[in-house]
Amino acid sequence: MAKKPVRVTVTGAAGQIGYALLFRVASGQMLGPDQPIILQMLELPIDKVQAALKGVMMELEDCAFPLLADMIGTGDPKVAFKDSDYALLVGARPRGPGMERKDLLLENAKIFIEQGKAMNAVASRDIRVIVVGNPANTNAWIAMKSAPDLPKGNFTAMLRLDHNRAKSQLATRTGKPVASVEKMIVWGNHSPTMYPDIRFCTVDGQPAVKLVNDEAWYRNEYIPKVGKRGAAIIEARGLSSAASAANAAIDHMHDWALGTNGKWVTMGLPSDGSYGIPEGTMYGVPVTCTPGKYERVKGLEIDAFSREKMDFTLKELTEEQAGVKEMVK
């Protein structure tokens, strides 16, 4: 029997990441080849932006995707999130020239408070949310705080781009296919402070630490390279990573919806207090997924170097939260 369509909200739908994302979602790459979807696309209520969104919708029509049951484009969050089952919050205020990080946090807080409240009012009670727009962890925390009637654990931040980057760099170093890299972890914030941890990682079944066998490379080259990859792409391309970010968002939601078959992936989650991370802090941790559910990988040993790196990224997250606390009471 044909499945009932699910509603997928995408914010920032006419932007670079939105454009790289929507066609793959509509083709079934996110929720599977037999799951019809209704796309609910949100963009700024500005004529020029809404016109661009209309153009994207025309292209979606022209693809004649069998799984795309319906779609709407709107400037109203209450319309975009109505009965939504999945939300990909891509739209965020980018950092402008001379803009302090603090100002960026406050500008984005307004957006994610409004969207959190809209979801709280009209979305499915089991909506699953990923925040892609930066600062992703703190934006996800703000949205979660602004939607008190929805399950806190259904709000997540995208660490999958860092996770995929970390896997790819390790595969390159070891000369093995990226598919052979397993049990990668990226702890903390989606920012250059995050900590890609390869201590439990295997490549072709071999311990990654033994294969690499170079602590100095790992600490001084690999970790900073993964952390600064986004900046390197901006320098090379003149634009921020869009297709790889869209790909990571699809990976994240695909695995959450359909499961990982026991494989570890990284998700930014509200902490349950494990690994010494204060409860509620939106923090990247390793998980495995079964359809519709994630489960944290527990009981991993944290050595002194890891503790230092994990606390460093936590400090940044705590400062970000403190910067917007007044707004999300």
UniProtKB/Swiss-Prot annotation:
Keyword list, A-Z: NAD, Oxidoreductase, Tricarboxylic acid cycle
Binding site for NAD(+): 12-18, 108, 115, 132-134
Gene Ontology molecular function terms on file: L-malate dehydrogenase (NAD+) activity
Highest taxon in the source lineage: Bacteria
Pfam families given in the database record: Ldh_1_C, Ldh_1_N
Residues the record lists as binding substrate: 95, 101, 134, 165
Entry's pH dependence statement: Optimum pH is 8.5 with oxaloacetate as substrate.
InterPro entries reported in the protein's UniProt record: L-lactate/malate_DH, Lactate/malate_DH_C, Lactate/malate_DH_N, Lactate_DH/Glyco_Ohase_4_C, Malate_DH_type2, NAD(P)-bd_dom_sf
Residues annotated as the enzyme's active site: 190
UniProt temperature dependence: Optimum temperature is 60 degrees Celsius with oxaloacetate as substrate.
Gene3D superfamilies found in the cross-reference section: Lactate dehydrogenase/glycoside hydrolase, family 4, C-terminal, NAD(P)-binding Rossmann-like Domain
Presence of the UniProt keyword NAD in the record: yes
EC number: 1.1.1.37
GO biological process: malate metabolic process; tricarboxylic acid cycle
Keyword Oxidoreductase belongs to the record: yes
Catalytic activity: (S)-malate + NAD(+) = oxaloacetate + NADH + H(+)
SUPFAM superfamilies, A to Z: LDH C-terminal domain-like (SSF56327), NAD(P)-binding Rossmann-fold domains (SSF51735)
General function of this protein: Catalyzes the reversible oxidation of malate to oxaloacetate. Catalyzes the reduction of oxaloacetate more efficiently than the oxidation of malate.
Family from the record: Belongs to the LDH/MDH superfamily. MDH type 2 family.
Entry-linked NCBIfam families: MalateDH-SF1 (TIGR01759), PRK05442.1 (NF003916)
Assembly behavior: Homodimer.
Name of protein: Malate dehydrogenase
Species for this entry: Syntrophobacter fumaroxidans (strain DSM 10017 / MPOB)
Classification of source organism: Bacteria, Pseudomonadati, Thermodesulfobacteriota, Syntrophobacteria, Syntrophobacterales
